[in-house]
A protein has these predicted regions:
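Hydrophobic alpha-helical transmembrane segments
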Residues: 12-17, 46-47, 69-74, 89-90, ...
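Membrane-embedded alpha-helical hairpins and interfacial helices in multi-pass inner-membrane proteins
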Residues: 41, 117-191
């Protein structure tokens, strides 16, 4: 699909709908993984980035315009505000801007390598959802966690994993790798299915 700068109503609707799909995937994975502390703390973000990668690549390729990623990240930040984590909105806006810089060159929205670079960076930085509370907003997060019904054992596990250098390094590497692998799957799906079906 040819990349242009002019947005249509259809582009806006498609961006919002696919952003909603991405957010639903993220929320569902998070809820399912909360059944086990290890899976929730260590693996869930990586699983999320892997599953979301093909949808993200489809969305950006389908729209073929700048600011798609920024819009998605902004919507994600608004969802976190509604969940009580106001500090994640400016953070995800910054993540969106970084991804837009990676995709800024004309034609990047149709280049798998550029899309992979953008989503891999987003995957690494998505860990801010767990790191920012510990580093800067612990009181806000702790009050939110208790108010939302989280058990103290869950909060203790969260602190243990995200303050251990070894576990933190593993989580960051795992999440980044899973985002990258998800893009490999997404590139294959786009090449073998979406383009042939006329979606792109």
């Amino acid at each position: 699909m040819k990349e242009t700068n002019k947005w249509s109503v259809r582009d806006v609707i498609t961006t919002v709908l696919l952003s909603a799909v991405l957010i639903v995937i993220q929320l569902v994975v998070n809820m399912v993984c909360m059944a086990n502390d290890f899976v929730s703390m260590v693996l869930s973000v990586g699983i999320t980035m892997f599953l979301c990668a093909p949808v993200y690549m489809l969305m950006v390729s389908r729209i073929g315009k700048r600011f798609v990623t920024l819009i998605y990240m902004t919507i994600l930040g608004v969802i976190f505000i509604l969940m009580g984590n106001w500090f994640l909105l400016p953070y995800y806006v910054l993540v969106g801007i970084l991804c837009e810089l990676i995709l800024w060159k004309e034609g990047s929205c149709q280049k798998p390598k550029r899309l992979t670079a953008a989503w891999t960076a987003a995957s690494l930085l998505y860990n801010g959802v767990n790191l920012l509370p510990i580093w800067f907003f612990w009181d806000t997060y702790y009050d939110f966690a208790l108010a939302s019904g989280m058990e103290q054992s869950y909060i203790d596990s969260y602190v243990r994993y995200y303050t251990s250098p070894g576990w933190l390094a593993f989580i960051l590497l795992f999440t980044t790798l899973m985002g990258f692998l998800g893009c490999m799957v997404g590139s294959r799906l786009i090449r073998r299915h979406f383009k042939k079906a006329g979606v792109l």
